[in-house]
Amino acid sequence: MGGDSGTGAAAAVRLAEGAALREAVGTADPAAWAALDAGVREIAPDQDAYRWLPAWERTEAGRALAEALTGGSDARPLAEGWLALGLCHRQGRIRAAALQRAAARPELLPLMVVRCSDWAPPVREDARRLLAEVLDAESAVRLMALILRIGRRDRGEFVTDLATRLLRAAPRDTLAPLYTDADRTVRRYAYRLAVEEGHLSPAELARAAARDTDTVIQSRCADAALAGLAQRDASGQAGLASGAVAGRDAYDDVLEPLLGARGAQARAAGVTALRRAGRSGRAAGFLGDRAAVVRACARYVLRQAGGDPLAWYRERCAAGGPALPAGAVSGLAECGERADAELLWALTSHAVAAVRARAVAGLRALDVTDVARMRELLDDPAPGVVREAALALLPCARMLDERWLMRRLATERPRQVRVSAFLLLNAHEGLVRLRAAVALIDDPDDRLRYRARQSVQRWRPTADVPRGSAEVGELLDRARLLDPYTVHRRKWEAGIKV
């Protein structure tokens, strides 16, 4: 079942008709429980009886549920589906009655978690008291995604605090399933708790930082791993300064996973730690990293050791060759000078498209723009190079011949050529911009068509538009995107008689 109240209302009808809870609700999905909770109370008009009631309450079972739940101690046992409906009922007395029966039904524990943030104080207090009696650490792990979801609600902090207390007191391995949960919010919670409680060694934290795809987890685990190493050094356990083998092994166990991680945050932390480990020379291997943050950390480490990253970049870029990493080109632009522009210009004809694109981006970063030379790069076969060249030319777009740019909008041109041409034409004002936008309002390319239509709708006549220009009126009429009043207003602003 999905996570909206409409599907929750449909599930409520199925439960009222006798369907099993697992059949009507995706019990493993926290969004499904939240949807059921809202869907049970979703009101729809009853045109026959002229009443507004949830759809499930119009069934025979729905009409009998209230009496069954409030019928006293001798009331007959209810199926889990009916109890689920009672736990989400719009009337607080029925929710409260359902809570007392649900406490002994583990399959209804998720709805007891939901009721801990109930808007009615008596129901909320009963739910919290009962949940504190039945929830254990294993159940908290199983329901953690739902617990964190409810914890973000008003009055929802109780469930997260309860789960945290249970997990802090549980054995360290209890958290293990949460480290690989599909929900990154759950993983963040688990690693934060593990770091606070010291459940993971520096090596385990480093492997987690290298493995996880979430940048928050990468940073948290990498920082904690390195902090753990520093603490060991301070307490004399690692013995790195004295050259102890145990200390070297400890750093290897932490640094190698970090340096080989896919995530930039983890690699950056590992590179920065090379200085403390006395291995600053290894940072040179990361000067050409694909991530800017890793390159910056590598430059810092080398400079602290007396190295010259700029000389390394100049040497590598001057040598060129197919093995030149694209990150080295970006690194030259990041710490180079305008005098390095010729090295970058030479790389705009490199055989590797990524190197050419980084070279063009580097020229833009150094604020070096030769319009004639940059214009030639608009015909590069690589879309990335064309995109970077267009961005570099954007500040001086009005220096380009608009008729030449208009011809590049033709549908037979490669897409990157058409996109770059429209980007540069749209940087103009007045008639040039309006002509380009109207030319593409029915373009087969969805994104180009959308951008063109947005440009038409935002167009205003500027000082360079001749007053009373008939072409403006014709273009606005062709666009067919504006209501009559707006067209009339634009024409009046352009000095056209209407």
Locations of the language-model features?
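Structural detector for internal amphipathic alpha-helices that build alpha-solenoid repeat scaffolds
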Residues: 51-74, 85, 95-104, 114, ...
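Long, acidic/serine-threonine-rich intrinsically disordered regions with weak helical/coil propensity
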Residues: 1-62, 337, 386, 433
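Gly/Ser/Thr-rich loops at beta-strand to alpha-helix junctions
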Residues: 92, 119-121, 184
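Intrinsically disordered terminal tails
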Residues: 430-432, 442-451, 457-498
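Alpha-solenoid HEAT/Armadillo-like helical repeat scaffolds in large eukaryotic proteins
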Residues: 82-87, 111-119, 143-153, 174-180, ...
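N-terminal segments that cap or nucleate solenoid repeat domains
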Residues: 3, 7-24, 32, 75-101, ...
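HEAT/HEAT-like alpha-solenoid repeats
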Residues: 76, 107-109, 122, 142-154, ...
